[in-house]
From Swiss-Prot:
This is Methionine import ATP-binding protein MetN 1. The keyword Cell membrane applies. It is a peripheral membrane protein. Signal peptide: none annotated. InterPro entries: AAA+_ATPase (IPR003593), ABC_transporter-like_ATP-bd (IPR003439), ABC_transporter-like_CS (IPR017871), ACT-like_dom_sf (IPR045865), MetN_ABC (IPR041701), MetN_ABC_transporter-like (IPR050086), NIL_domain (IPR018449), P-loop_NTPase (IPR027417).
Length: 341
């Protein structure tokens, strides 16, 4: 649906070249809710602006719904843009226009009939839960209601793609949750592909099925949300995951336990999925290795509606200790594991 092929973007400011994007490649599949996460300055917003051609790539290709738009003119982009909706952090509503007129604006600009405009706007306001606010003005609405108006406006033209640039950053946690639920409903009801730009890993965890992690203009990690949360490969991905889920004990706790430890030991970090959480894993391990298994840390969370568990286990070692059987057990049970000592 959206594909970036070795995309780079360079800005020239005061005779200085700034590389906003460097050799970015990934694909957003049809019906994805695809998250792009990174800190400020990572290049996220520049990336999303390439999709609707608000910016043009310096190098590489940007493919949107089968069209290579890299070198499209504004005229050539008109039909493509009809299939792309966008919402922003600060809503971008017309304060002098009613809710109804704000939502209707794309249809008015497209010179649709009054009958069609009324029908379509009414449908969208009902979908976002603001039918009773149609005659009010933006200043009379809460932040969450303003974003719902913006979503209705983005959907009113029946787009195939919805771009969300930090759409929940200005909202409180409860309102953020309600907006994410609405966006998930947009995806499921209309089959709209959503590309989420955010710096909040909780947004990725709650709504996205796939994610790209950006740092300094580069995509440093991609994968399903479950893959990235279960085994983040890069330091930045690990840092983002740790903001919403504690996946291992604190360094101070490990240091204290190591100081108290008598004899040699081996530690394992394991990731247990929902289908495995009811299995007698610890009991099985005790029987396999013939010794006690210490649980140094355990935490449970929900990712994409599935319960997952992170555990840090410790085995005391002696001459009879054999880890081959333990490793084989984890592999047979499809339990992701990592030896950490």
């Amino acid at each position: 649906m959206i594909e970036f092929r070795q995309v780079s973007k360079t800005f020239n400011k005061k005779k200085q070249k700034i590389d906003a994007l460097k050799d970015v490649s990934f694909t957003v599949n049809r019906n994805d809710i695809f998250g792009v996460i990174g800190y400020s300055g990572a290049g996220k917003s520049t990336l999303v602006r390439l999709v609707n051609h608000l910016e043009a790539a310096s190098n590489g290709q940007v493919i949107v719904d089968g069209h290579d738009i890299t070198n499209y003119s504004d005229k050539m982009m008109r039909d493509i843009k009809k299939d792309i909706g966008m919402i922003f952090q600060h809503f971008n509503l017309l304060n002098s226009a009613t809710v109804f007129k704000n939502v209707a604006m794309p249809l008015i600009l497209s010179k649709k009939s009054k009958t069609e405009i009324k029908q379509r706007v009414t449908e969208m306001l009902e979908f976002v839960g603001l039918s009773d606010k149609k005659d009010q003005f933006p200043d009379e609405l809460s932040g969450g209601q303003k974003q719902r108006v913006a979503i209705a406006r983005a959907l009113v033209t029946n787009p195939k793609i919805l771009l969300c640039d930090e759409a929940t950053s200005a909202l409180d946690p409860a309102t953020t949750a309600s907006i994410l639920t609405l966006l998930k409903n947009v995806n499921q009801t209309f089959g709209i592909t959503i590309m989420m730009i955010t710096h909040e890993m909780r947004v990725i965890k709650d709504i996205c099925n796939r994610v790209a992690v950006m740092e300094k203009g580069k995509v440093v990690e991609t994968g399903t949300v479950k893959e990235v949360f279960s085994h983040p490969k890069t330091t930045i991905a690990q840092n983002f995951v740790s903001t919403v889920i504690q996946t291992e004990p604190s360094t101070s706790l490990i240091r204290r336990l190591n100081d108290e430890q008598v004899g040699d030991f081996k530690d394992y970090k394991i990731f247990v999925e929902e289908t495995q959480v009811t299995q007698p894993i610890i009991n099985d391990l005790i029987q396999i290795c013939g010794r006690e298994v210490k649980i140094l840390f355990s935490s449970m969370s929900e990712i994409q509606g599935n319960t997952v568990c992170y555990m840090w286990l410790r085995f005391n070692m002696d001459q009879q200790f054999e880890d081959t059987a333990i490793n084989q057990y984890f592999k047979e049970k499809n339990i992701q594991f990592e030896e950490v000592h």
